From Swiss-Prot:
GO CC annotations, alphabetized: lipid droplet; plasma membrane
EC numbers: 4.2.1.137
Entry function: Catalyzes the cyclization of tetraprenyl beta-curcumene into sporulenol.
Reaction(s) catalysed by this chain's protein: sporulenol = (R)-tetraprenyl-beta-curcumene + H2O
Effect of deleting the gene: No effect on biofilm formation.
Name this polypeptide is given: Sporulenol synthase
PFTB repeats: 395-436, 465-505, 513-554
Disulfide pattern: none
Top EC class of this enzyme: lyase
Topology versus the membrane: Peripheral membrane protein
Gene from which this protein is expressed: sqhC
Pfam families in alphabetical order: SQHop_cyclase_C (PF13243), SQHop_cyclase_N (PF13249)
Broad class of the protein's primary localization: membrane
Length: 632
């Protein structure tokens, strides 16, 4: 019994106790799902444009205060701590949200600083198109001289190009955004008369809405002309597109009134329905507003509008982590969590079935009330959390659905199957390659492999495993790492790939495994920690943070401990850092570890320091026990 082992056991016991104490009566765990200030800003704009200012004064004031609390001393806003020069889109969002609230005024020093930053960076021209859309819907930016091809929505999925070639995330936002844009709808915000002081040269030029980093303007013109030829349609067909878009949205409203349970999509939907003549006082609009309001919470005391809850995800991860640290399957915490999760298994045919028509529903979604949008990541997490014998039929149905979602290339993606059309990837919109398609990713593929190996008992001999492992090695980076799409970033992808392949029996002597282990060890900080910048997701190259984070250190340790023993120097140093109370500073805990959309939406999962630290210390202690047993 060394001092480090004793320290780890104390840490383990403390974390388990904290998690037990935080479990809700219904078996779930609730932690903040904290993203950018965009949601606060957009909801303030919507409420004030709907003349809800007097009725919702307290809510608007708190959301504005939440924005102001995150403003930097120089007046800018940033999406992650080491984005040192300020983020233009985030600063516009913050500035406009505060101004629209009526709680802050242009003459205040912090507002003047934000103005100066925006003006010095070219005004509004280079703001992300989704924020431009929000400004235009509120009469603060001109709609572009461009109509989006809503006729696309009316095309049958049997054609080579159709609406379901876009990712579910893109579709659920594209539909309301396209309707509102094509209707040239404006809901005047009475709290902001104009933003011309930020940009006197606003233009209807559609090229200012498009990505220009990869194309010359002449190339953009040719691409747009190509899309126009593909989707050129008579007026009647365009009207059919409008109606199809409306039906598409209405059919995907959750019981709380939100669209797909996303605050962002719901806000866009409200504008689009208003543009189609739906009354602002109609039940559907009122339920949507109420649903968005239900997502307002406090993250570390700061008012924040979550884009959705993360209840299913958090509950599954925590229950599994507890079980990996000695909490039995029959323990009340585990059984209550299992019952909560079982109630949220999906039972209806939804959009995922377009590309996967022969599978029976059985997956799980991310949020507390999601019934439309299951995903492979949540499904694997839930199936690892629910003991197999707790509900065998539901468990097997989940496994069957998950296996049916394997892509033709052998990998797994987040929401849907085989949604990676090359023409969609080439759309000249910022982040199209990250948001418009849903390709196989190393993190999803690795996490599915981990579940199939650990819980289902699949090995390298199984066809599903062979195809997935082949995909992973084909997509390994030259330096030995893997890129993770939904977490930051190369540490995340490498952790998922290594733990997944180990669970299925891939030998440590494999050159790809050796290369990955060498890479992980090479990026460890001198204090034993690991840390990676969100910048990695933006330039698709590993960028060190030059300081440690608790979550990324836990991922790296978990990965190393799959192939190395507990006495390996990297493991010892890392475990000392992870379990040292001084390491758990605000900076090391608060750094975003999740990615919704690179450059725009980074996520701080408040549950992650608990979950992944616990998994790492549990594996460390298991490793010691196995090594001791082997010695005797």
């Amino acid at each position: 019994m060394g001092t480090l082992q004793e320290k780890v056991r104390r840490f383990q016991k403390k974390t388990i106790t904290e998690l037990r104490d935080r479990q809700n009566a219904d078996g779930s765990w609730t932690f903040c799902f904290e993203g950018p200030i965009m949601t606060n800003s957009f909801f303030i704009l919507l409420l004030t444009s709907l003349d809800e200012g007097e009725n919702e004064k307290e809510l608007i004031s708190s959301l504005a205060a939440g924005i102001h609390a995150k403003q930097q001393p120089d007046g800018t806003f940033i999406n992650y701590p080491d984005e040192t020069r300020g983020n233009l889109t985030a600063t516009v969002q913050g500035y406009v949200g505060m101004l629209a609230s009526g709680c802050f005024h242009r003459t205040e020093p912090h507002m003047k600083k934000a103005e100066q930053f925006i003006i010095s960076h070219g005004g509004l021209r280079h703001v992300h198109f989704m924020t431009k859309w929000m400004l235009a819907a509120n009469g603060l930016y001109p709609w572009p001289a461009l109509y989006l091809p809503l006729s696309l929505m009316a095309l049958p999925p049997t054609l080579p190009i159709h609406f379901y070639q876009f990712s579910s995330y893109a579709r659920i936002h594209f539909a309301p955004m396209a309707v509102t844009l094509n209707q040239r709808f404006v809901l005047i915000n009475r709290n902001i008369s104009s933003l011309h002081h930020l940009d006197p040269h606003m233009t209807k030029n559609p090229f200012t809405w498009l990505r220009s980093d990869a194309f010359e303007e002449r190339d953009l013109t040719s691409i747009l002309l190509h899309w126009k030829r593909v989707f050129h349609a008579p007026f009647a067909f365009q009207q059919l597109g409008l109606q199809t878009a409306k039906t598409y949205m209405l059919d995907r409203i959750e019981k709380d009134g939100t669209l797909y349970s996303y605050a962002s999509a719901t806000i866009y939907m409200v504008y689009s329905l208003l543009s189609l003549g739906v009354s602002r006082y109609s039940p559907i609009i009122r339920r949507a507003i109420t649903g968005i309001k239900s997502l307002v919470t406090k993250c570390n005391g700061i008012p924040y509008l979550e884009n959705s809850t993360s209840t299913v995800w958090d509950t599954a991860l925590i229950s599994y982590a507890l079980q990996k640290n000695g909490v039995t399957e029959t323990d009340g915490s585990v059984t209550k969590a299992a019952d909560f999760l079982l109630e949220r298994q999906h039972t209806k045919i939804a959009d995922w079935s377009v590309k996967n028509p022969n599978s029976v529903p059985g997956g799980w979604g991310f949020s507390n009330i999601n019934t439309n949008n299951p995903d492979c990541d949540d499904t694997t997490a839930v199936l690892k959390a629910i003991p197999r014998n707790h509900s065998p039929a539901a468990w097997e149905r989940g496994v069957s659905w998950l296996l049916s979602m394997q892509n033709n290339d052998g990998g797994f993606s987040a929401f849907e199957k085989n949604v990676n059309h090359p023409l969609i990837r080439l759309l000249p919109l910022e982040s199209a390659e990250d948001a418009a398609v849903d390709p196989s990713t190393a993190d999803l593929t690795g996490r599915v492999l981990h579940f199939l190996g650990e819980k289902v008992g699949f090995t390298e001999k199984h066809q599903h495993i062979q195809r997935a492992v082949k995909w992973l090695f084909e997509h390994q980076e030259q330096n030995g790492s893997w890129y993770g799409r939904w977490g930051v970033c190369y540490i995340y992808g490498t952790w998922a790939a290594l733990t997944g392949m180990h669970a299925c029996g891939v030998d440590r002597k494999h050159p790809g495994i050796q290369k990955a282990l060498r890479w992980l060890k090479s990026i460890q900080n001198d204090d034993g920690s690991w840390g990676e910048s969100c910048k990695s997701a933006e330039i698709k190259t590993y960028v060190p943070l030059h300081r440690g984070t608790i979550v990324q250190t836990a991922w790296a340790l978990d990965a190393l401990l799959t192939y190395e023993n507990s006495e390996h120097p990297s493991v010892v140093k890392g475990m000392q850092y992870l379990t040292d109370s001084s390491s758990h500073s605000a900076d090391s805990l608060a750094y975003p570890a999740g990615i919704g959309l690179p450059k725009q939406f980074y996520i701080r999962y408040h549950s992650y320091p608990y979950v992944f630290s616990l998994l790492a210390v549990g594996k460390y202690l298991d490793s010691i026990e196995k090594e001791t047993a082997n010695e005797t």
